[in-house]
Each structure stands twice: as structure tokens, then as C-alpha cells.
Amino acid sequence: MEGFRYQPELIEPAFEDALVAQLRELPFREFEFHGYKGKRRVVSFGWKYEFAGGGQLHKAEEIPEFLIPLKSIAASFARMEPDAFQHVLVTEYGPGAGIGWHRDKAVFGEVVGVSLLAPCTLRFRRKMNGKWERVNVLAGPRSAYHLTGPARSEWQHSILRVDALRYSITFRTMR
């Protein structure tokens, strides 16, 4: 899939453990989309996208210091400067939580996601000649993916329900 890169074991298990200890202390809130509450919990840094009211972008708290080393690792993986990432979304997926088909909002550019703890199935689809073309990727613990170009703009993605606790740390550039 053009514009998609996947890297297993981007970080060491000890770094994952340290991150998870910090993530557990974040002020998560239930994800809400047009009155629907998802099973996942989220917290945004740098910028926050509000789905209510037609979708608005607001300045959010600065990216926490404990995420800066991971931001640098994610930037290196994506072959860009760390400061290119202006938005971070941390998502907590409890057992049974997933996310439906979507594309990240147009205000965001390139995307790097880092997966912690439980593995998940990251699904992609796009309509080609009236048929859905599909790709599934098993995102293991400590892995990362990068979406740019067609993978970012032409393909939708979703995550099947997870069996155990999973954290996703999504770094995004701004357009």
C-alpha cells in the first residue's frame, strides 16, 4: 500500500513499561462523536479536534515531557523533524473497544501511530472500480505505522475490537 510503512518493535519493552505507567495517570475522557460515546478514552495534546459544532480545532495542553522521547523516535521512523508533530492523541482501548472506518480529519497531515500493550488488527480499505480493496495489518506491541500520501488520503482505516488493554499514541502533523 503506497504511503504506508510498518515497523515492529519500534521501542524496547522497558520503554513501553515506563510509558504505560505515565499514560495511566493522564486525564482521559470518553470519546464522543455526535452524541455517540465510544468504548475508548482519549486525551489530546498540542491541539484538540472537537467533533461537536461542525468540527473545530482548539489549542490544547502542551505535549507532556514524558512523550518527547517517543515523539523523537516516531519522527525518526517517519524521516521528519520531531517539531513537525504538533498534535498527539493518546487513546486507551479497553477490552472490546475498537474504532470504525474513518480517515483522520483534513486539518491533519502525516500520521504516525505507536501501539502499546495488546496487539490489534489495523484494517484498511478503499473503493476501486466499484469494489472495496482491503488490507489487514497485525499491529503488535511497541510497533509503529506511518500514513502519508495515498495511504493517508485514499484509504480509510479501522481497528477491530481488542481482547486486552491497548494504548495508541498518534502523532500528527498539521496542514
Model-derived features with residue positions:
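Non-heme Fe(II) oxygenase metal-center motifs and adjacent flexible, charged/small-residue loops
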Residues: 1-175
